[in-house]
Amino acid sequence: MSRSLRHGALAATAIAFSIVSLSACAAGNNAETLKVRPDNAATSVGSIKVQNANVITQAEAEAEGPAAVTATLFNDGTEAEVLESITLPGTDVRVTIRPAKGKGPVEIPAGGRVILGGKGNASAVIDEGREATQDGNVQQIVFKLSRTGDVALGANVVPATGYYKDFGPSA
């Protein structure tokens, strides 16, 4: 094989390699491979997105007491929404919703978010947590909003230990 053929073959190989490797850049940051569903409870209805929904029970399995509903609610719309209620279908338990400060409704501002659970955030407390659900289950939850209506999803039920300790019913 002559020297010029070797150089030509080497150049062709280098070009082919760069085309293959650089073509991945054309996929953009919204490639299908990036559409991985998270392993936490999340859904969207209209302009409302609910992410990372959990029901956090007492730390000890035998302990009685309240449980907390935690989630982040995003409003991508142009008008504010009010979180009117949270229900757990199939149960008769009551969920008490309180804003982060003061009294009144929990409002999700247009283009904003509300975090339920944790210090300094709005809260949603299930008065009789153990009657509603058990650790390890998936509990159906319905968030009722003033404009969007019902937003339903299944939330993981976890005890207030580890990462969830600061978001649980006593937080």
Q: Could you tell me what each predicted segment is?
A:
Residues V20-A24:
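C-terminal motif of bacterial Sec signal peptides marking the signal peptidase cleavage site
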Residues I15-I19:
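Alpha-helical transmembrane segments
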Residues M1-A12:
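Bacterial N-terminal signal peptides that target proteins for export
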